[in-house]
Regions:
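Low-complexity, proline/glycine-enriched hydrophobic segments characteristic of transmembrane helices
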Residues: 1-12, 61-72, 302-303, 378-379, ...
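Interfacial loop-to-helix junctions that mark the boundaries of transmembrane helices
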Residues: 11-18, 35-37, 64-83, 112, ...
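Membrane-interfacial loop-to-helix junctions in multi-pass transporters
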Residues: 17-22, 80-84, 110-123, 149-159, ...
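Hydrophobic mid-bilayer segments of alpha-helices in multi-pass membrane transport proteins
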Residues: 19-30, 37-63, 81-93, 234-242, ...
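Helix-loop-helix module between adjacent transmembrane segments
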Residues: 91-96, 124-137, 164-172, 198-210, ...
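Juxtamembrane and boundary regions of transmembrane helices in multi-pass small-molecule transporters
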Residues: 100-103, 151-155, 159, 171-172, ...
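Hydrophobic transmembrane alpha-helices that form the pore/transport pathway of multi-pass ion
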Residues: 117-170, 181-185, 327-342, 367, ...
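Transmembrane helical segments that form the transport core of multi-pass membrane transport proteins
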Residues: 238-335, 411-419
Length: 419
């Protein structure tokens, strides 16, 4: 029953049954994205406007300035949004510079000349994302795929590229925003390492099926163009950009700053493909709109920390930004951080807008924005998520850590090795 008395107190915000209206507006936005995949930016902006209007009218405690900029006691969303903006634009330029270096042209020499070539490429992407940002790994992988498959990339293989970029970052505190957040919050890097057990198990599912899909759709090219010369200065610029991202991520928790310092310095050496910004802006605004909407959802608490909760959060992260989810889990405490790193990191691969890597890749391959086709052709990613999760639970078990936040509950579920 819709509540009508909304002015009395802040607690009287409208809901339909037990569901707050903000969640319904968010769900309608996601449905709109799925139905109108050629107009995703406009759908996301309409959804953002609707949620903001609702918050302004019905939520007395909402302050947009405090939400974005923050207060003396709590940081706002500005850092996440600014980093996201800088990384999506910056790595679009990086991918183009990498393509212009001609390295993708000579890669067929090092890749097997059958379906295993696509599998090796996915493995390379996964390794890259273990020490690079997953957006960079996805963009580099997508650039290579564009060349070695003559521009004909199966949507199932695109889903596999996104999955590989997220799988590699799951067990590394520098490979994904969620694991970096854990590290900053006090989670030890070794506590997330066993997420690689799940990632490797998942790779054998999405990697093999994705590579076979691609081989049937468009085999890897075997001939290498003659007279191709690698532009080593552009390779240096790519390397410089990646190093800049890693350094400023370590030192300032602001990888986008290092990316853009390196791009500007690199522009003094080689011409920078600034026109890539015009291709990436719609996808960037789309993701920033969804992240902003997600950050305004009234998620005050989660169910008790358990492997079941962590498993479900993986599916939630496919549609709900994993950054606020991770923040909430860190505040709650009591999780096995390796299990959570895998679920909230890899889970976003199941839908193209579930992770920043997927949105970045969709700027290069607009066909990935067809949500129905992505889910249908990328079915192996969801299967891989489930298989990887239970392999990790069987091999490593559920090993929760005591809450490291002051005031959090000190009791955690008993440690056990099987679900």
């Amino acid at each position: 029953m819709l509540l009508t008395n909304v002015a009395a107190t802040a607690a009287s915000i409208p809901s339909i049954g037990p569901i707050r209206v903000e969640f319904i507006l968010f769900a309608l936005t996601l449905i709109g994205v799925a139905l109108f995949h050629k107009k995703t930016m406009y759908v996301a902006l309409i959804g953002l406007a609707a949620v903001l209007l609702f918050k302004f009218i019905f939520d007395p405690g909402f302050n947009l300035g405090h939400h974005i900029i923050g207060t003396a006691h709590e940081e706002g969303e500005w850092r996440i949004l600014l980093n996201l903006l800088g990384l999506l634009f910056g790595f679009a330029i990086l991918a183009r510079i990498f393509e212009e270096s001609n390295v993708p042209e000579i890669l067929p020499r090092f890749l097997p000349n059958d379906w295993k070539g696509g599998l090796v490429l996915l493995f390379m992407i996964m390794v890259l994302s273990s020490f690079l940002d997953n957006i960079a790994a996805a963009m580099i992988g997508g650039t290579i795929a564009m060349v070695v498959f003559k521009g004909k990339v199966h949507i199932g293989y695109l889903a596999a590229i996104v999955a590989a970029s997220n799988a590699g970052g799951a067990g590394s505190v520098v490979g994904d925003t969620t694991t970096t957040l854990m590290w900053i919050d006090g989670v030890e890097p070794v506590w997330v390492l066993h997420a690689f057990v799940a990632s490797i198990a998942a790779f054998f599912i999405f990697g093999i099926f994705g590579a076979i899909q691609q081989h049937k759709f468009q085999p890897i090219i075997s001939e290498i163009p003659t007279g191709v010369k690698v532009d080593w200065l552009k390779i240096f610029i790519v390397f410089f950009i990646l190093v800049g991202a890693i350094l400023t991520n370590f030192l300032l928790d602001f990888p986008a700053l290092g990316v853009w310092i390196a791009i500007l310095i690199g522009s003094l050496i080689r011409k920078t493909p600034w026109n890539e910004l015009s291709k990436a802006w719609q996808g960037t605004i789309f993701l920033m709109s969804l992240v902003t909407i997600a950050s305004m959802m009234p998620v005050e608490e989660l169910p008790p920390a358990s492997w079941q909760t962590a498993f479900i959060l993986g599916f939630v992260s496919a549609v709900f930004d994993n950054i606020p989810l991770t923040k909430l889990c860190l505040e709650q405490g009591g999780y096995d951080w390796g299990v959570l790193a895998y679920t909230v990191g890899f889970g976003g691969s199941m839908i193209w807008f579930g992770s920043s890597a997927g949105v970045a890749l969709s700027n290069m391959y607009p066909q990935a924005k067809n949500t129905v086709s992505y889910i249908k052709s990328g079915w192996h990613v969801a299967v891989a998520y489930v298989v990887g999760f239970f392999v990790m639970l069987w091999v490593v078990g559920w090993q929760p850590h005591e809450p490291h936040k002051k005031g959090a509950e000190k009791e955690t579920p008993a440690m056990h090795s099987n679900p």
